[in-house]
Amino acid sequence: MWRSLGLALALCLLPSGGTESQDQSSLCKQPPAWSIRDQDPMLNSNGSVTVVALLQASUYLCILQASKLEDLRVKLKKEGYSNISYIVVNHQGISSRLKYTHLKNKVSEHIPVYQQEENQTDVWTLLNGSKDDFLIYDRCGRLVYHLGLPFSFLTFPYVEEAIKIAYCEKKCGNCSLTTLKDEDFCKRVSLATVDKTVETPSPHYHHEHHHNHGHQHLGSSELSENQQPGAPNAPTHPAPPGLHHHHKHKGQHRQGHPENRDMPASEDLQDLQKKLCRKRCINQLLCKLPTDSELAPRSUCCHCRHLIFEKTGSAITUQCKENLPSLCSUQGLRAEENITESCQURLPPAAUQISQQLIPTEASASURUKNQAKKUEUPSN
């Protein structure tokens, strides 16, 4: 709950939406008029909070984003955030147009996916957006947030929190299109938040101690040599001011984008990169061990002390900096997020050992971590 409050507070304090390509003058203003064929999606969504996702059908990560957007829609609806319009605009390129149907099939009929015409004015350009950007508008069509990578990853809570703020807070002033039903709902949400804040004791910030370990933050020199902050093939948007306030990170901004916009502090960026890499239970790992090794029946949850973040195209790779022990080398893959991680195998919890039923004589053993059931959790970094 405190994590959610921290995110909400950080987003409330934003003077900008979190993307270097966004001109601050566009905030709290309606976007340039755009249409696809004979449809005007923004006009059709007047009176509701509107979420515009710029996704590319030829991009594997964008396909995953579309699937997660559908999950987010269902989640928010169950929580009572029902007056939201979702719009996906596919890239204009030929490869994306050919895979339009694949992108459309990843969402329900409640999320329209628009395919741009080859010769029309590019909607992405009109909106000053890039691949995987999320633009969030209030009920009067005014831009509240423009989130870009890595903050637009739906594995992070930033897009969800930004939608909730646009839904219940008047970031751009009053809107005459807000219904009494929505106002009543937001009042209940506000009261519930206050009640939880009063009832919940002050948290002990164990994570601050956690960050003091030497392996938690990597210097900028440990990034891939091929990764240039602001390179066209691997854009990294700057951290919106205050977005990481609850982590108490401080640092000077560095310049790296051609437009000379502020880039995030090194610690903030590294922390985000670790969040991308660190997944408590990787779905399936194969631990290659000698048949006579005592470790053979014990492994498969993994831990790496020093992660190096790399982004190549649509792939996100997390690798161990140190050499892995000769008796235990693992390679895991999260297929649904295209994240590869090298790791060290660790002894999993007893419940996990029992459920794995591994055979000691096998040269290799595989296990599946039941993270959702909370029966098998991998050691965190």
Curated annotation (Swiss-Prot):
GO terms for molecular function: selenium binding. Phosphorylation sites are present in the extracellular medium. It comes from the Eukaryota. The modification Phosphoserine is found at S266. It is found in: Secreted. Keywords: Glycoprotein, Phosphoprotein, Secreted, Selenium, Selenocysteine, Signal. Glycans are attached at N46, N83, N119, N128, N174, N338. The C-terminus is not required for endocytic uptake in the proximal tubule epithelium. This is Selenoprotein P. The lineage of its organism: Eukaryota, Metazoa, Chordata, Craniata, Vertebrata. The gene is SELENOP.
